[in-house]
Amino acid sequence: MEKTKDLADLSSLSERKRRDSFGMFDGYDSCSEDTSSSSSSDESEEEVAPLPSSLPIIKNNGQVYTYPDGKSGMATCEMCGMVGVRDAFYSKTKRFCSVSCSRSYSSNSKKASILARLQGKPPTKKAKVLQKKPLVAKLAAYAQYKATLKNQSVNKAPVTVEGFSWGNYITSNNTAAAPVTCFRHAPMGNCWGDIAEGVRVEVPNTDSNLPTKVFWISGIVKLAGFNALLRYEGFENDSSLDFWCNICGPDVHPVGWCATSGKPLVPPQTIQHKYTNWKAFLVKRLTGAKTLPPDFSQKVSESMQYPFKPSMRVEVVDKTHLCRTRVAVVDSVIGGRLRLVYEESEDKTDDFWCHMYSPLIHPIGWSRSIGHRFKRTDILKKQESNYDAPSHLFTKVKDIEQGSEWFKEGMKLEAIDPLNLSAICVATIRKVLADGYLMIGIDGSEAADGSDWFCYHASSPSIFPVGFCEINKIELTPPRGYTKLPFKWFDYLRETGSIAAPVKLFNKEVPNHGFRVGMKLEAVDLMEPRLVCVATVTRIIHRLLRIHFDGWEDEYDQWVDCESSDLYPVGWCQLTGYQLQPPAPQSNKDSQSNISKQKKKSKSQPYKGHKKITALQLKDEMLDGDDYTFLQGASDQESNGSGSYYIKQEP
């Protein structure tokens, strides 16, 4: 009977397509405002038997358990998020609800599943099974909550845990985000074009009571990185149904996509009776308007293809001894960020995160070629499946001719402290390497064996000539233990018998980066490089940016170059499936302030991270996209030569 009805609907749909030369309202005519309950709503309102508070029931891995006293231990599966009785969980550690979840976690299938969904691929068979579990998890949480209330005999409101939303954060703080064009290393960074306010797209219509997925046209009201605040056509100045979405998401399309894909365009029911002829309204509104290029989704997909692959071997800085490099193997690639596992790590827990364009990674043999210190790896531990990453994959540094007036050992300069990125310090050139590389030491805090010397290229934007901080009104950190304050370079050079490095040898190029003070972005905490956090640009000195991590003290700020591959547009984590660290709660900030006053970071703990990572929990951000297009008559588009397309009416 159901099949007969579907065939009849399909036949009726085909007939309407023949009558309508535009093909726009193929789903609208047959979907008049019908307030009768749909099959989808019937399915969603599934009856669930109430759970007695005295005898909560937990279904775990196919088994049903009860705990009359409500005191039995609970556990949450680290793979699928299922809540259940701890004793029924798998393995001694009770971290997983089943053998399947344990193995899936180890094989990193969760990450692959997330990336597949973000890229618009259909879910795997396992993913479909996991989608059925949230109901069980809710039942378990409800049962645990009821049991807790009974034991405490105190009426307390449940704590609501909400995920961080960039859209709400931008709106509530009335701030702006750095545009995607500021990040050339990010997806679409080089082809963002004229994607701006006013561009029209087609997205799912969420203001509809129809049982099927329908679409409507929206305009970009505000841009925040990859995210856009959209407003449905027809709402004029009414912002009541405005919503945020990621423009690069799988549900966002150029105007014309619905017509070519046979998807219905249906106006939101809130304004459904505002116009009698919606077709004429859209033609008038959209003729001459801009939309996304037809191959926009293809460009997004192509920009998220990365040349580095798992099992590739590279040389990377040793996070325990900054003066040397070690061999590491690419374990995974997310959004261009590499998780590198040091080759001699047997349990694969000794790792390091960086972007594929980072100056901290190099091809195998780089250290030997320039005279850099290198920790040798036991050749017996090298796995046959690993292979050296091709040299052309790495970022090329500027070719420099080291003449007679080149940097020399003992010369003084100013440099960002790699162990305290909020400080620019008095520094000394300790060794001159080949190809323009220098080993730099921070005066007053160097290890006796030079293990904390750091390698900077002469063109690095992280080293500066003597006097840079004074000229730009930046606080210069004097050598530890130096008592003649305020610090004066002239006196210090005379006392140490040193000379300043020539100003002409430093990088003076300042690109038109587009950053402005107050702009929001996502930034890597370089002291714990696996974390990407909500951040703000608080100061700009030429090409140098002062990055503040929202919710944390200023002492955690970091100086970063404007072209750093550790900065990303708002929405990058959501797009790539990476985990975004939200601003720290005020309580954590206060406690952290007290801790920081009592205990300063030790110089012997490089890249261990600030205390803030103990208070933050990694949270998965799921992509929430929306799709957009237009009628066939307006699907003919003209490129304006700059990335966006104009919509023209068919003659």
UniProtKB/Swiss-Prot annotation:
SMART domains, alphabetized: MBT
Biased composition (Basic residues): 597-610
A biological process from GO: double-strand break repair via homologous recombination
Gene Ontology terms, MF aspect: histone H4K20me2 reader activity; zinc ion binding
Signal peptide: none
Residue stretches of biased makeup (Polar residues): 632-643
Cell compartments where the protein resides: Nucleus; Chromosome
Annotated Zn(2+) binding sites: C77, C80, C97, C101
Protein name: MBT domain-containing protein 1
MBT repeat copies, ranges: 164-268, 276-373, 374-479, 487-583
Pfam families linked: MBT, zf-FCS_1
Zn finger (FCS-type) location: 68-103
GO CC annotations on file: NuA4 histone acetyltransferase complex; nucleus
Function: Chromatin reader component of the NuA4 histone acetyltransferase complex, a multiprotein complex involved in transcriptional activation of select genes principally by acetylation of nucleosomal histones H4 and H2A. The NuA4 complex plays a direct role in repair of DNA double-strand breaks (DSBs) by promoting homologous recombination (HR). MBTD1 specifically recognizes and binds monomethylated and dimethylated 'Lys-20' on histone H4 (H4K20me1 and H4K20me2, respectively).
Originating organism: Xenopus tropicalis
Region (Disordered): 21-55, 581-610, 629-651
Keywords: Chromatin regulator, Chromosome, Metal-binding, Nucleus, Repeat, Transcription, Transcription regulation, Zinc, Zinc-finger
Alphabetized InterPro entries for the sequence: Mbt, PcG_chromatin_remod_factors, Znf_FCS, Znf_FCS_sf
Compositionally biased region (Low complexity): 29-41, 586-596
Gene from which this protein is expressed: mbtd1
